[in-house]
Amino acid sequence: MRKKIASILLIFTLIIGLVGCEKKIDTGSISGFDDNEEYISMWVHTIENTPEGEAYKKSVELFNKKYDGKYFLDIEFIPRNESGGGYSDKINAGVMSGDLPDIITVDGPNISAYVSNNIIQPLDGVSDEDKSAYLDSIIEQGTIDNKLYALGAMESSVGLFYNKDIVEKAGIEIPSMDNPWTWDEFYEVCEKVKNIIPEKDYPIDMTFPSGETTIYYYAPFIWSNGGDFVSKDGLTVDGYFNSVKTYETVNYFKKLLDNKMFSKTKIDNLFELGRSAFKFDGAWLPNNIKNSYPDFNLGIAPYPVGNNWNKERYTPTGSWAYAVSSNSTNVSAATEAVKWLSGIESGVILSELTGNMPSTYDAYDKLPQFKDEIYSFLKEQLIKYGHPRPKTPAYPQVSEQYQRMLEDIVLNNKDEKETIEYSIERINAKLKRYR
């Protein structure tokens, strides 16, 4: 009987403790918060005194002004460190302690993992009309099992940039976005470039670096070839990661390297210094070129596609998004804040301060840089062909293994089957807990 009473008291104590946690306001500053307002707490992944941090701060200030007397949004800046920790460590600690804020920022590819680990919950009250304001890629990125969990603070894209002077000298005609070069055609284009450049130079400036870059830049080669990384439910890699389409993609990269279409080792600024004709890079490259290489004659071409491309979406997308944590008890208010922070006005502010691409259609119309030839192309590519990265709770492992696979097989000539099957084993080791 004593044990039973003790157990009941323990449970009661835990419940009281949890209730206390729910009511506790302990994030950020509460300056400007009135008792009659509904308090909304938020963590973001950067520091305040950066262009991105300033954009978030300004959007929060505008939200609080618009909803004065109803809501108060309180932002706390928790920067990531070079290894990606810091912010992630804070999130993990918050999960363990039950002390997450109402809103957190989530890198787009990790949304599925956050859902599977019950870190975030579905948004509340986002209508079809609300959704129609966002790019399809934003809604697809944030939707898991037909429920919308996140809305993007921004979007992103990668372009196949080219040196107009070299391309013109080689007699190459750039295809339209809807009729890109196939792999075979792109190889022939690279041969033409190789015939007119010095032997120490290369047609393409590309590498397979560790980190997120490799899957971000080169997943389109898998998708446009009819392949994929995981099943639709994100829980199966066997038959996908090791499919015939994957082997074909790897061998295409090997063909490019073996015929010296790109360098086995990274050469800094190869493209920028006029020593290659093509480079896969993010939407930040044009501005970098303009500032550091003002005489560079820059163009942009569509991503090459598999020889049997079926016109499906395939180009890179994805960036940071806002989500409501599973700890939040005021989901409706938090969702209103998420809609504001990811909306048109906030998107314009973020793009003006950082150069990032907005997540809503109308924001582009308010930004003059997207009338520029290159930025307009990136926008249209994103709208027409943008494809989110693999949606799986084991996304970090999928990303890591894709990079390792390309490095080991293409650059280091390791056995294809052994390398790919090892990758399957590593990803499956993570997926077991979710099946």
Residue ranges with predicted function:
Residues 114-119, 138-176, 207-234, 316-324, ...:
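Periplasmic solute-binding protein
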